[in-house]
């Protein structure tokens, strides 16, 4: 449970986290307060309009359409890939260095410093406590339960969890932060000195070889800002539901030297956070954002003059903010790398600044000068006490931590029960917050039970994977639907595959059955097969020969190409013709191919 105690250093409460439950105390306002969305009084927060001035970019005489720029870039990338190049030749004398700051929304019921709900899909400005909008007299109340998913993340990322951590104020003014400061953990974060291993299967750059380890400087808890929406009239609408939602900021060391590896790092961290239930959603739903710090230096000129997070010898860095996809991370780094190299080659100097990047763009743009520690005026938050984490809590969380993605990947590939390819296993792990992987495992377990009577060793895991990823995935995509494990229950999928593997139905019949269930047929698989008379009535050898000879007679040119030029891939097309002129539900593709090979290649 969570006990309130007095700090030796101040009269405000601190929180001691020990095993057994949670009990929040020390609130100025003992219950969550919501601000009315009605009326025109000074406390209304339904909408806050802020006028801004923007200037449009002008097109010069050398303007090149964006579509043409992207096509030329894609063409150059394909050419480089064909030549086996790992980076453009003109950049070989330049070293790129990247550090990443990842902001992830924690999966919690309440906000970080109030009891207001942390729900993300509610009506705008309906979950707002007094402290969230910095009303006079309101104070933060740390919600200890929000620390649990943060600790899971730190353990999964191999961090040293600090027994004592504290909150600080980071001062700046912007419309999405009404207090004029953000509460974070600058000086004493709750986790330090972590690491993440990226293997070749994670999509790292070729120059990184079989794998690379990236250090994590620290992970800190902090509050999120309001969600803003810009209108064409240079006005912003603000939703304060997001203010004080709990975030963790994961800061990597600047040890990444390739855009592809940077994107792989963000992807891997997201997968790990999702696997341990630390975060709500991933990048695709806005639950995770990344800032990247980019610098370059010329190898032939020795080490650079700058340092970042204790790593020395670097070039001057710039920061690119709010990247919301893995592709955006990679493309923004490429664009900024190319810009910095061009500036340095022209004799210029790189300025430390914050830059932005827009999806589909080919270059970054300056947003503002880069603030430093002095600009933010960091100071300990006088309204919040230290957070003390008990060793027993860490032991309990470690014992209950789910299997991490790398171990899970190894199991899916190496265990004969599953026997998946690395690509299929990775896809299952990353899709739908792990729900599709759970569905796959359920279907495999059911199929194992259905095939206990077979003497051969079970090898249906790969078949189930193909159906889950390709057949079911294709139907979901075609229907523009999100993942739903009840669309085709795992029991139904296993029964279809069982019938197919026992040659009781054909492949085309299996797909038809699957589509019927997907479209809402509530009958059992056995009932559908019986009602629709779908059981395979095998053709005799003589019937297969007759069908094959008819197809060969209709396609003499193709038969000649197969026989004389050994174009064996065309046999599959002839099998399709046998299915067309015969009974599709009775023709077995494997037997039809065997007869064709026997007649053509004899």
From Swiss-Prot:
InterPro entries in the cross-refs: Asn/Gln-tRNA_amidoTrfase_suB/E (IPR017959), Asn/Gln-tRNA_Trfase_suB/E_cat (IPR006075), Asn/Gln_amidotransferase (IPR018027), Asn/Gln_tRNA_amidoTrase-B-like (IPR003789), GatB (IPR004413), Gln-tRNA_amidoTrfase_suB_CS (IPR017958), Gln_synth/guanido_kin_cat_dom (IPR014746)
Catalytic reactions on record: L-glutamyl-tRNA(Gln) + L-glutamine + ATP + H2O = L-glutaminyl-tRNA(Gln) + L-glutamate + ADP + phosphate + H(+)
Pfam families, per database record: GatB_N (PF02934), GatB_Yqey (PF02637)
Keywords from the UniProt entry: ATP-binding, Ligase, Mitochondrion, Nucleotide-binding, Protein biosynthesis
GO BP field: glutaminyl-tRNAGln biosynthesis via transamidation; mitochondrial translation
UniProt-annotated location(s): Mitochondrion
Molecular-function annotations in GO: ATP binding; glutaminyl-tRNA synthase (glutamine-hydrolyzing) activity
Annotated EC: 6.3.5.-
Main subcellular location of this protein, as a coarse class: mitochondrion
GO cellular component: glutamyl-tRNA(Gln) amidotransferase complex; mitochondrion
Subunit structure: Subunit of the heterotrimeric GatCAB amidotransferase (AdT) complex, composed of A, B and C subunits.
Role: Allows the formation of correctly charged Gln-tRNA(Gln) through the transamidation of misacylated Glu-tRNA(Gln) in the mitochondria. The reaction takes place in the presence of glutamine and ATP through an activated gamma-phospho-Glu-tRNA(Gln).
PANTHER family: GLUTAMYL-TRNA GLN AMIDOTRANSFERASE SUBUNIT B MITOCHONDRIAL AND PROKARYOTIC PET112-RELATED, GLUTAMYL-TRNA(GLN) AMIDOTRANSFERASE SUBUNIT B, MITOCHONDRIAL
Remarks, miscellaneous: This protein may be expected to contain an N-terminal transit peptide but none has been predicted.
Family as reported in the entry's similarity comment: Belongs to the GatB/GatE family. GatB subfamily.
Protein name: Glutamyl-tRNA(Gln) amidotransferase subunit B, mitochondrial
Species for this entry: Paracoccidioides lutzii (strain ATCC MYA-826 / Pb01) (Paracoccidioides brasiliensis)
